[in-house]
Amino acid sequence: MKHKSEFLNFIQERGYLCQCTNIEGLDQLLLQNNYVVAYIGFDCTASSLHVGSLIQIMMLRHLQKFGYKPIVLLGGSTTKIGDPSGKDKARSVLPIEDINQNISGIKKALKKMVYFNDGKAGAIIVNNADWLDSIKYIDFLRDIGAHFSVNRMLSFDSAKTRLDREQNLSFLEFNYMLLQAYDFAELNKKYGCRLQIGGSDQWGNIVNGIELGKKLNLPELFGLTTPLLLSAQGKKMGKTESGTVWLDGDMLKPYDYWQYFRNIDDQDIGRFLRFFTDLPIDEIKKLESLKNQEINEAKKALATEVTKICHGDKEAELAQSSAVSVFENGDSSLLPDYTITKKQVANGISLIDLLHDIGLEPSKGAAKRLIQGNGCKVNDYTINDINYIINSKSFKDQSFIKLSAGKKRHIKVMVS
């Protein structure tokens, strides 16, 4: 479907466009206004975002590219409740201190990928605690709650799925969709925001906000969803067997971030190049047409471009050159390192414990299975003894040992 606005044509061609509440109306708004404000919300449940949020971050960047103003809404208040969308059970309630620390970490990561200033397309960060924390309950029920039908709320997936499975849905979580709807109304009143963007699991929450806007006699609001980020195997993106793929370089080294995208399934190459890079479509088509061993060149291009956006050109080029040196030239000097103490070496440390402590495996059980499956190497020698101990003999005359989990995860273990 061809649209009148360049923005909608662009996001459709890249695969971002999933659902829209009124595509013709939004198309007209974007065409006639060179100043449109849109928002994307992020819960503050961790001290960084992970790659599961990357599509939304790219949407922020694309809004700016076309001259529109994005709002990053951080859920300083709604995180205290937790969004039930796509969840089987309620999240643990986070202390306010943790939420505030998480907000700082998320801001740090976002500022590397989106530009924030007072310009026409400069993004702004807003915390919904600014208005939700001061709400008076009775006033909220009267002025906002009266506009919501419980029957309709129960029909949305966030509630319906839990109830169909006879899983508990607390009154606290049930209120989340009212608060998110209220956020949209507040952002319209304060900033003239007309568009909310979110993952497809947010459809019900977005529709509630638009319907509330109508009942409050606000200008027409619009909602647009992007596809949920799934791998070729149908798994949600964001976590691997080794742990979460964080966007913060202090929580996941740029080298490991680069490796994550270098090792994606062949079937994901074209889709991920469209989603996560700024490469033009013509170049993407050339890369996704590569066959056999040449596919690896497309994966390297993807990994480098994605790492540039998240960590900058310098870190991306360093990650790529390190990978080439390690995997193609056999150079261990550029491997990520982990330090253990002389006392640990003297006492001996279990290989299973070390694999887990380093983060090469998420659990000791996984480390044991890796060894039993001949997937673990020490200094390029396969170890299949689950009782293997790393001690001074392991280092011999070297200052480090190379520890490998599978073909693509390697760490240099040093002694201090």
From Swiss-Prot:
How it assembles, according to the record, is: Homodimer.
Role: Catalyzes the attachment of tyrosine to tRNA(Tyr) in a two-step reaction: tyrosine is first activated by ATP to form Tyr-AMP and then transferred to the acceptor end of tRNA(Tyr).
- The lineage's top-level taxon is Bacteria
Q: Which GO terms describe its biological process?
A: tyrosyl-tRNA aminoacylation
Checking HAMAP family in the record gives: Tyr_tRNA_synth_type1
What are the record's GO terms for cellular component? Answer: cytosol
Note the SS bond partners: none
Q: Please give the name of this protein.
A: Tyrosine--tRNA ligase
* EC number(s) from the headed UniProt entry: 6.1.1.1
SUPFAM superfamilies per record: Alpha-L RNA-binding motif, Nucleotidylyl transferase
**Which residues hold ATP?**
K239
Domain S4 RNA-binding per the UniProt entry, residue ranges: 349-415
Tell me the enzyme class.
ligase
Q: Where in the cell is it found?
A: Cytoplasm
Q: Which source organism does the UniProt entry give?
A: Wolbachia sp. subsp. Brugia malayi (strain TRS)
Q: Name one GO molecular function term.
A: tyrosine-tRNA ligase activity
Could you say which residues bind L-tyrosine here?
A: Y39, Y176, Q180
Family the UniProt entry places it in: Belongs to the class-I aminoacyl-tRNA synthetase family. TyrS type 1 subfamily.
Reactions catalysed: tRNA(Tyr) + L-tyrosine + ATP = L-tyrosyl-tRNA(Tyr) + AMP + diphosphate + H(+)
Instruction: Extract the Pfam families matched here.
Output: SYY_C-terminal, tRNA-synt_1b
Motif 'HIGH' region, per the record, lies over 44-53
- Segments carrying motif 'KMSKS' region: 236-240
